[in-house]
């Protein structure tokens, strides 16, 4: 009898669960920004450097002067 259950188990295959469809987001679901503080504009000349890496020093200095804080900006986000 155990041979019967073994053979039956080999024939029954679990169907994969259908992927849940992600809810689409449209413009009506997006609200206004909260706690937004505009610090500065960054132009193409501010970020490009000859070696392909961004020059963050000047931009960081602009941001520091705009926000009125002596915050040390991290270079970890620089690519």
Swiss-Prot record:
Keywords per UniProt: Cell membrane, Cell shape, Cytoplasm, Cytoskeleton, Lipoprotein, Membrane, Palmitate
Q: How does it sit in the membrane?
A: Lipid-anchor
- Cellular location(s): Cytoplasm, Cytoskeleton; Cell membrane
Spell out where lipidation (S-palmitoyl cysteine) occurs. Answer: 10-11
Name the principal localization, coarsely classed.
cytoplasm
Q: Name one GO cellular component term.
A: cytoskeleton
Instruction: Give the superkingdom in one word.
Output: Eukaryota
Q: Where is the composition biased (Basic and acidic residues)?
A: 63-72
Picking any one GO biological process from the record gives: regulation of cell shape
Where are the residues of the annotated region Disordered?
Answer: 41-79
One GO MF annotation is: small GTPase binding
Q: What does this protein do?
A: Probably involved in the organization of the actin cytoskeleton by acting downstream of CDC42, inducing actin filament assembly.
- Homology family: Belongs to the CDC42SE/SPEC family.
Please report the name of this protein according to its UniProt entry: CDC42 small effector protein 1
Native source species: Xenopus tropicalis
Gene behind this chain? cdc42se1
């Amino acid at each position: 009898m155990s041979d019967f259950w073994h053979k039956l188990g080999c024939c029954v295959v679990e169907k994969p669960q259908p992927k849940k469809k992600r809810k689409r987001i449209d413009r009506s679901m997006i609200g206004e920004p909260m706690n937004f503080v505009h610090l500065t504009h960054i132009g193409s000349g501010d970020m490009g450097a000859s070696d392909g890496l961004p020059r963050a020093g000047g931009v960081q200095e602009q941001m520091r002067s705009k926000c009125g804080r002596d915050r040390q900006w991290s270079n970890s986000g620089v690519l």
